[in-house]
UniProtKB/Swiss-Prot annotation:
The lineage of its organism: Bacteria, Bacillati, Mycoplasmatota, Mycoplasmoidales, Mycoplasmoidaceae. The keyword Ribonucleoprotein applies. This is Large ribosomal subunit protein bL32. Belongs to the bacterial ribosomal protein bL32 family. It holds the Pfam family Ribosomal_L32p. Residues 7-18 have a biased composition (Basic residues). PANTHER family: 50S RIBOSOMAL PROTEIN L32 (PTHR35534), LARGE RIBOSOMAL SUBUNIT PROTEIN BL32 (PTHR35534:SF1). Keywords: Ribonucleoprotein, Ribosomal protein. The gene is rpmF.
Amino acid sequence: MAVQQRRSSKHRRDKRRSHDALTAQALSVCQKCGKKKLFHRVCSCGMYGDLRVKKAY
């Protein structure tokens, strides 16, 4: 296993970690029931846009 040759500075460490932040998922609102859903996914009520694609239970 590799061993580091020199200690990394705080600046270099933080620059490396600058791309590690997570972003929240973008959500849309169902036109029929008003629930939040992911884009390009079928809503839990069974609607995909203005098409009914599955039965709601």
